[in-house]
Amino acid sequence: VTQICNLKCHYCAAGGDGTYGDPVTRISIEKTLPQLKFFIEQLKENQKFTISFVGGEPLLYPEAVKSIYDYVVSLQAEKKFSPQFSLVTNATLITDRVRDILKTMKIHIAVSLDGSAHINDIARPTKDGTSSTALTLQGVQQLKKIHSDIGSFGISAVTTKDNLNIVDTYSFF
């Protein structure tokens, strides 16, 4: 959906802001939907596939995620296929509006969180260098409210020298 991110993770391969040095902001829905239709037309009947929304931070543009989801689901009337959807997010942008969008979707959500604030904030600070963990945990609480409406959600952690103590990390989660 976008390469841009609202955090500045130290281990980000995309330069910490998701741009890889390019001025890319977000995908064009007008270009993406015909490409998806072409892909789906190539599928065999009842074939399964997964669309993964990654970034950057895909929830910078939740309407784009919803548009793609709705479009793919609408194509099921024309051709039988089995789409699955996943989304990787830092969960810092899950407002009531975003939560309401997500709860209309059957989607598997992975929240990027490397451990407690002490650990997570080393690698995943906000762009101004402050803690992102409290925002992420607020987002996790929002996701808990819609857990039965969405496909599933869990935590995805990047293992680094800072969170190798699995007992401490496990205790946090």
Walk through the language-model features, giving the residues of each:
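Short acidic donor-binding/metal-coordinating loop in glycosyltransferase active sites
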Residues: 55-56
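Canonical Radical SAM [4Fe-4S] cluster-binding loop centered on the CxxxCxxC motif
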Residues: 1-29
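Radical SAM/AdoMet-radical enzyme domain recognition
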Residues: 33-52, 61-173
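Short, surface-exposed alpha-helical recognition segments that flank or form part
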Residues: 23, 27, 59-60, 131
